[in-house]
Amino acid sequence: MNSIKLPRTIHIGGKGQVKKLTLGGTSPILLQTMWKESLLGADLLSIVKSLNELEQLGCDIVRFAVPDMDSAEQFVKLTRLTEMPLVADIHFDYKLALRCMDGDTAKIRINPGNIGSKEKTEEVIRKAKDTGTAIRIGVNSGSLPSDLKKKIEEANSKRNLSGDKKALDDEISLLRADTLTEAAARELEIFEKADFKDAVVSMKASNVRETVMANEIFAKKFDNPLHLGVTEAGPLIQGIVKSTIAFYRLLEQNIGSTIRVSLSDSCENEVIAGREILTECGKRQGGIRLISCPRCGRKGFDVQAFVKRWQTKLLSEKKDISIAVMGCVVNGPGEGKHADLGITGAEDSVIIFKHGAITKRLDLKKLTEEEKIKAVDKAFIEELQSL
């Protein structure tokens, strides 16, 4: 059985004021998200502010859709305003990739299923070499080359005529994974002939099983760094579940150099989800680990409201500590005593504790709801800052 290859090391960014990042090898796994809005008419300084906030949450790279030349012009301007390494997501028109590389672009993402002829890809590679820009070959199950699509269509036709659909389903899943790998391999051949070494690869299906199989097959044959993701993963809960299953299975085998949790939700939630997955898989250390109880009828403290109010701020902190937010005195400070800092409540009082020892009690009986929130937040921030 072929073993997983250690991915080659490549560098992205480093132009202008953009941070230089190391990808692959034994480097930490990088966390990405994708900007959710059009660049057309956008306030670029406002985007820079948002990029800074995403960085505080733990984001390393942000990708932007560049569907037309006006968007490419905006993208080039944006690359010169931020330290965040930016990726231009290009489909159909290779000239958009060429224009984006005039900026301080960290990486270009192209899709071999729709970028056009080999000659167009070669022109993109030449400019990438000249400008020191990495390229991601992004293969999606929905946009495979026509001959590979035909293979899958023929297999599906046989399945519809078969009595043993389950057996054929397994074969078709493997075939789909193979076609994703084949599409990537074909494109890589062009890159290798051009002696272009800074190529990252991604192979994504909306099906977890096929995504995992494709990346496993690829990682045994090639040493290009892999970007992991499940395409069209879905809304918040479904998307996180799919991504977590796929990433865990791959990261446990040391497959993957970057990840993105694709969600029909905010960039912030993509980053938070990705960060938590990396932490729980033992692939990222540091930062605040937020623990909270699921709530029940005993609750004396509104865990949900407190977490909603504090989550982004806490996850932006660089302190390497754990914080427990517990709904009642059963869970805190007793079950939360392992935490560096914790908070809970009982009736009209709030308790703040460190390593299970109570450090502060607040009597909220005579306060309005607004005053209660202010008092709790003030006491909590004081204890947090003391750590």
Swiss-Prot record:
* Gene3D superfamilies recorded: Dihydropteroate synthase-like, Sulfite Reductase Hemoprotein, domain 1
Where on the tree of life does the source sit, at the highest rank? Bacteria
Q: How is the cofactor bound?
A: Binds 1 [4Fe-4S] cluster.
The metabolic or biological pathway listed in the UniProt record of this protein is: Isoprenoid biosynthesis; isopentenyl diphosphate biosynthesis via DXP pathway; isopentenyl diphosphate from 1-deoxy-D-xylulose 5-phosphate: step 5/6
- GO MF annotations in UniProt: 4 iron, 4 sulfur cluster binding; 4-hydroxy-3-methylbut-2-en-1-yl diphosphate synthase activity (ferredoxin); 4-hydroxy-3-methylbut-2-enyl-diphosphate synthase activity (flavodoxin); iron ion binding
Question: Does the keyword field hold Metal-binding?
Answer: yes
| Essential cofactor(s) | [4Fe-4S] cluster
Question: Per UniProt, what is one Pfam family of this protein?
Answer: GcpE
- Write the Enzyme Commission number(s) for this entry: 1.17.7.3
User: Which UniProt keywords are listed?
Assistant: 4Fe-4S, Iron, Iron-sulfur, Isoprene biosynthesis, Metal-binding, Oxidoreductase
Q: Which GO terms describe its biological process?
A: isopentenyl diphosphate biosynthetic process, methylerythritol 4-phosphate pathway; terpenoid biosynthetic process
Which segments cross the bilayer? none
Q: Identify the residues that bind [4Fe-4S] cluster.
A: C293, C296, C328, E335
Catalytic reactions of this protein: (2E)-4-hydroxy-3-methylbut-2-enyl diphosphate + oxidized [flavodoxin] + H2O + 2 H(+) = 2-C-methyl-D-erythritol 2,4-cyclic diphosphate + reduced [flavodoxin]
Q: Summarize the protein's role.
A: Converts 2C-methyl-D-erythritol 2,4-cyclodiphosphate (ME-2,4cPP) into 1-hydroxy-2-methyl-2-(E)-butenyl 4-diphosphate.
Q: Which family does it belong to?
A: Belongs to the IspG family.
Q: What is this protein called?
A: 4-hydroxy-3-methylbut-2-en-1-yl diphosphate synthase (flavodoxin)
Instruction: Name the gene.
Output: ispG
